[in-house]
Amino acid sequence: KQIQKLGYTCLLETGAGLPSNFSDKDYKDAGVRIVKSASQLWKDSEVILKVRGPEKSEISKIQPNQHIISFIWPGQNKSLLDSLNKKKTTVQAMDMIPRISRAQKMDALSSMANIAGYRAVIEAGSQFGRFFTGQITAAGKVPPAKILVIGAGVAGLAAIGTAQSMGAIVRAFDVRPEVAEQIESMGAEFLMLDFTSDGSGEGGYAKPASKEFIKKEMELFREQAPEIDIVITTALIPGMPAPKLWPKEMVDLMKPGSIVVDLAAEQGGN
């Protein structure tokens, strides 16, 4: 409705709303024109709004001088930028919106990260072999699950809150010591590294850590791995591939039946 008030005609691929329980009729009633295929949508639209950036199969469908609003990750996707440049496409990279109060209403990255953090715990729970919360039964005692969340940004904090509410013992690590208060306020334990320099960067983001810091970090993770049932990694560095924090060495130290959920997989994985 807000877009239509600006004078735009809205188009939607048929069936696109079904995973969110919105039928084509719901959109038609709201004045949206339904098109039969994604190809037709690309052909008939001047402005494309989508969550993920254009896939390789979609590059050929882009029209000259088309406008795309999406997550682009320009620092990691030079080939995509080159392809868009050849098409003379105007791009708004939603992942590049600064973390400031004035831009908060446009912070699509944080809203998606919040969903991802919640969903990470739900998916881990569906694969885990027992309840998150501890139980005392006539047959004996079942200990609560121990969950480690690496990275306490929006996704990490959402995962911490969800896991805590489900009765798990939650530990969290972040290279930025200033997030300790947020983690502890949610009932989780903050794993602190005794180090003179940290990984705090500008705008609340992390920055690449020193070799000495990484060495201490790996030592901490080696201590935690045998105890932890579920690891959820969320660490990202703007404009760079995701840092490698939980390699095969850590996985091998974990108990049989343990779960690893890597929310940074799209950017190279933690």
Predicted stretch roles:
Residues K1-F22, T133-Q224:
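Glycine-rich phosphate/diphosphate-binding loop of Rossmann-like nucleotide-binding domains
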Residues K1-S83, K87:
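An N-terminal-biased, well-structured beta-alpha scaffold segment characteristic
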Residues T14-G17, S39, G53-P54, W73-P74, ...:
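Short, ordered loop/turn segments at secondary-structure junctions
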Residues D24, I59, L81, V121, ...:
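Generic hydrophobic/aromatic pocket-lining and core-packing "Φ" positions
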Residues G31-E46, G53-P54, S200-D252:
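A structured beta-alpha segment of the ubiquitous adenosine-cofactor-binding alpha/beta core
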Residues K56-K146:
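Glycine/serine-rich phosphate-binding loop and adjoining beta1-alpha1 elements at the start
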Residues P74-A103, M240-N270:
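Rossmann-fold NAD(P)-binding glycine/threonine-rich loop
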